[in-house]
Every structure is written in C-alpha cells, then in structure tokens.
Amino acid sequence: MSRTVNCRKFKQELEGLDFPPMPGAKGQDIFENVSKKAWQEWLSHQTMLINEKHLNMMDLTDRTYLNQQMDKFLSGEEYDQAEGYVAPEK
C-alpha cells in the first residue's frame, strides 16, 4: 500500500513520494506535503523553464529563481510560464 499525503498543490489526499526529492529540511517538507503527481508536474514544468528561459544551473541567480518558482508551483500560487510554449495537441 502506498503512502498518501495531503497535497499542498491539489488540496487533497494523493499518493506521496517514495523518498525526499532533495536533502535537508526542504526535501523533507516536500516529501511530507507534496504528492507524486504534483512533483512530476513540477519536474516537467522545471524542464520547460530551464530550456525556454535558457537557465544555467551553475548560476546562483538562476538556481534561486528556479527554487522560487518551485515553491510557488507546489503551493498553488501563480508561477512563471515559459514564453511562447504551446501545449502539444492530444
């Protein structure tokens, strides 16, 4: 049986992550309060932001920006979108 969490983003009980996605208190907070579904959506959005905004993960400013966007995304707040992105038709 998988563990469930009260997801901060979707405001409902959903399947939780199998392990903290990063070390430290922030990783533990995500593990305890963010669902697997929300985390997968964040990873996809993060990839779009890195590619479309040409973020350099070696640059502290870009990493800080991405962390701020992650916090907003996972909290259900308004977050930046990749300019010019058009979702593929299904």
Curated annotation (Swiss-Prot):
Name of one Pfam family that matches: Iron_traffic
Annotated GO biological process: cellular response to oxidative stress
InterPro entries linked: Fe_traffick_prot_YggX, Fe_traffick_prot_YggX_sf
Superkingdom of origin: Bacteria
This protein's UniProt keywords: Iron
Coiled coil: none
Gene Ontology terms, MF aspect: iron ion binding
GO CC, one annotated term: cytosol
UniProt similarity note: Belongs to the Fe(2+)-trafficking protein family.
Annotated HAMAP family: Fe_traffic_YggX
Described function: Could be a mediator in iron transactions between iron acquisition and iron-requiring processes, such as synthesis and/or repair of Fe-S clusters in biosynthetic enzymes.
Protein name: Probable Fe(2+)-trafficking protein
Organism per entry: Saccharophagus degradans (strain 2-40 / ATCC 43961 / DSM 17024)
